[in-house]
Regions:
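Short helix-coil transition sites and intra-membrane helix breaks within transmembrane domains
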Residues: 11, 22-24, 55-60, 185-192
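Membrane-interface alpha-helices at helix entry/exit sites of multi-pass transporters
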Residues: 1-2, 35, 42-46, 207-216
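Inter-helical loop and helix-membrane interface segments of multi-pass membrane transporters/permeases
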Residues: 27-46, 61-122, 126-128, 158-179, ...
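Hydrophobic core segments of alpha-helical transmembrane domains in multi-pass membrane transport
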Residues: 6-10, 50-73, 109-121, 138-151, ...
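Juxtamembrane transmembrane-helix boundary signature
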Residues: 2-38, 234, 238
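Hydrophobic transmembrane alpha-helical segments of multi-pass transport and channel proteins
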Residues: 8-12, 16-17, 57, 221-226
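Alpha-helical transmembrane segments of integral membrane proteins
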Residues: 9, 44-54, 133, 137, ...
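Membrane-embedded translocation segments of transport machinery
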Residues: 130, 134-248
């Protein structure tokens, strides 16, 4: 309930606002806001800086993913995946003030990710981002469908799915649930990040902004539910196999 309330009261309205501004003023977030009123241009730089900071740690996580993709062929993590991740892969030190050595696989992974990003951006919107999205988005959806189908066939998957789809009405009155719901909507739709405003600046002149906002929000919502089914089915399997409650 809080999630859907957040979608209709914040997600879709703010998408319409950002799409509308980007479509009308034809520019990045700082430029679009500057074209409305020059003295408010600085507001547009806040989400731009935030997006750059997020990109920094996203690149790190993607580097981990690239490395683990190569590890998966030989199951390099062995029997103790936690110890491998923290000690062998990350090579964590005992204190934040204790500097360790350079972890070259992670650095090379980051360089690889940035090189791909640079190439896509260099090719522009139509030749880069659009072409990449036409390949990567269907691939992502296909992979998630395969994972979800496999997950629901696992022993104990129904335990996880029952947890997902059985409402706990006592949680509705807790503020933290509403904060989490709105946070999820803002994060997953990239609201107030400047991304949607910049993308919409490339839309054709006669684009139906309202329809685009609804389609984006509902498509995102559908993918999140597909992901939730896969995750909770796997959690149910893990809880059953370890004879634990799913909440643990």
């Amino acid at each position: 309930v809080p999630y859907f309330f957040a979608i209709f009261t914040a997600g879709i309205p703010l998408l319409i606002l950002e799409y509308g501004m980007g479509h009308k003023y034809k520019g990045s977030t700082p430029l679009a806001i500057a074209r409305t009123n020059k003295k408010w241009e600085w507001l547009g730089w806040w989400p731009t800086i935030s997006a750059f900071m997020i990109l920094g740690y996203y690149s790190m996580i993607l580097s981990w993913a690239v490395n683990y993709f190569t590890f998966s062929f030989s199951k390099k993590w062995g029997n103790d995946s936690n110890a491998f991740f923290h000690n062998d892969f990350l090579q964590l030190t005992s204190s934040p003030f204790e500097f360790g050595k350079m972890v070259w696989p992670i650095l090379l992974g980051i360089a690889f990710i940035w090189a791909i990003n640079w190439f896509i951006c260099y090719k522009g919107v139509k030749g880069g981002i659009e072409k990449a999205s036409k390949i990567l988005l269907p691939t992502l959806i296909t992979i998630m469908i395969i994972i979800a189908i496999r997950a629901v066939t696992l022993n104990g998957a129904t335990t996880g799915l029952n947890t997902l789809f059985t409402p706990d009405w006592s949680m509705v009155m807790k503020p933290k649930v509403w904060v989490a719901a709105y946070g999820q909507v803002f994060f997953s739709l990239s609201l107030a990040m400047g991304i949607m405003m910049t993308y919409s600046s490339y839309l054709p002149k006669k684009t139906d902004i309202n329809n685009s906002a609804f389609m984006t929000a509902f498509a995102n919502c559908g993918f999140e539910f597909l992901s939730a089914i896969a995750v909770f089915a796997i959690l149910g399997y893990m809880a059953t196999s370890q004879n634990l409650q799913i909440g643990r």
